């Protein structure tokens, strides 16, 4: 696998230690990201944490702030911007590094980090794609504005169900997992 990712800087703080990576996309998330990363530290025994940063200026995702908390920091230096570009960089990196699967979550503190072991379990069981949901039994969301919740539940999800023929409960959720096979499938 070659690295077809947009231009970026890579800061590797230690070697790969797990078959799965947790990729967190951030851009000036500040204290929300700092609190989320602290909550994720206990999971470093299960996954390598990779930060995909859009060249934030808030300092929360600087190399000095992260060097003892994550495996790798990837900083987008390309003219292309947006969360999808950050994930392209991180997924290409994860494939080059040989990870068996990748779990993605946004760095805004809105995803329930306690579900991370379930994602790892499902990847180990052979699932190729796992989609998080804030709206299923046991689902969780924090700090999501009510107009966004209503729009997702009663506008976007029904449209996605109709278009895809699949019973999505939260197609907008950025908390998802993918196997290596899924990522490499043309």
Task: Please name every model-derived segment.
Residues 20, 72, 100, 128:
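Conserved acidic residues
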Residues 4-11, 28-42:
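Short, well-formed alpha-helical segments that are part of the catalytic scaffolds
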Residues 53-62, 109:
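A conserved acidic beta->alpha catalytic loop
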Residues 31-34, 58, 85, 170:
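Residue-level preference for short helical/loop micro-motifs built around acidic side chains
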Residues 46-57, 75-77:
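Short beta-strand/loop segment that forms part of the nucleotide-sugar
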């Amino acid at each position: 696998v070659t690295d077809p990712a947009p231009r970026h800087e890579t800061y590797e703080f230690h070697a790969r230690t797990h078959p799965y990576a947790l990729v967190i996309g951030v851009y000036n998330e500040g204290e929300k990201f700092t609190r989320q990363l602290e909550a994720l530290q206990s999971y470093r025994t299960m996954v390598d944490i990779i930060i995909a940063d859009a060249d934030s200026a808030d300092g929360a995702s600087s190399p000095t702030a992260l060097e003892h908390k994550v495996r790798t920091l990837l900083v987008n230096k390309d003219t292309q911007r947006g969360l999808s570009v950050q994930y392209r960089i991180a997924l290409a990196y994860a494939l080059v590094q040989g990870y068996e699967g990748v779990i993605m979550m946004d760095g805004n503190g809105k995803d329930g980090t306690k579900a991370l072991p379930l994602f790892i379990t499902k990847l180990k069981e052979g699932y190729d794609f796992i989609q998080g949901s804030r709206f299923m039994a046991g689902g969780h969301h924090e700090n999501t504005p009510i107009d966004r919740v209503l729009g997702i539940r009663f506008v976007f999800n029904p449209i996605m169900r109709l278009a895809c023929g699949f019973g999505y409960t939260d197609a907008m959720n950025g908390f998802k997992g993918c196997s290596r096979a899924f990522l490499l499938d043309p």
